Amino acid sequence: MKNNSIRTVVATGIGAALFIIIGMFVNIPIFGNTSIQLQYAVQALFSVIFGPITGFFMGFIGHALKDGIQYGNISWAWVLASGITGLVIGLFGKKYDVTMGKFSVMSMIWFNLAQALGLLIAYGVVTPIGDKIQFAQAWSYLYAQSFVAGVANFITIAIGGTLLLAIYASSRTQSGSLTKD
C-alpha cells in the first residue's frame, strides 16, 4: 500500500507539471476564454494508468496552478471540472485496462463513454453553475462556453487520449505472449 501511495503522489506531481506546461504552451483559442487544451489527452492517459485519484488531482492542481500563473486568477469551477474529468476516466479504468497490453475496440468505446460522462458532469453541470456563483455571468454565455469547451475536450481526448492509450498498450507485454524457445 505504501508503494502505491508514493506512486500516486509522484504520478500526480509529474502529471500536474505536464498539465501546466502543455496547457500554457500548447493551446488553440476557439471561443471567449476557451481553447482546445491538449493536456486533457495526457490527463486521460495518467487517469487510466495511475487511477482516479491521480487523474483528479493532476487536473485539479495542474489547472489551478496553470490559471494562477497564466491569468493571475483562478476559475474554481473549471479547475474542479478538470479534476472531475480525470476522476471519472480513472474510475472506469478497469473497463479499458491498458497495462495488460490490450486496447481493443470495445475498450476504446468504454474509454470514450467514460470520458463523455465525465465531461457531461464537468461541463454540463459544474462549470456553468460554478461560474454563475463566482462571476455572475449570463446563463446563455455560461452554457455556450461550457458546451464549446466540453465538445473540444471530448474531441481532444477521443483522438489524443485514445492514441496515447493505444500506443501505451502496444508497449506493454501481453499476458501469455512470451514463449520459451
Curated annotation (Swiss-Prot):
InterPro entries: ECF_substrate-spec-like, UPF0397. PANTHER family: UPF0397 PROTEIN BC_2624-RELATED, UPF0397 PROTEIN SPR0429. It is found in: Cell membrane. The keyword Membrane applies. Its main location: membrane. It is a multi-pass membrane protein. Belongs to the UPF0397 family. The chain crosses the membrane at residues 11-31, 45-65, 72-92, 109-129, 147-167. Gene3D superfamilies: 1.10.1760.20. Keywords: Cell membrane, Membrane, Transmembrane, Transmembrane helix. GO terms for cellular component: plasma membrane. This is UPF0397 protein str0306. NCBIfam families: PRK13661.1.
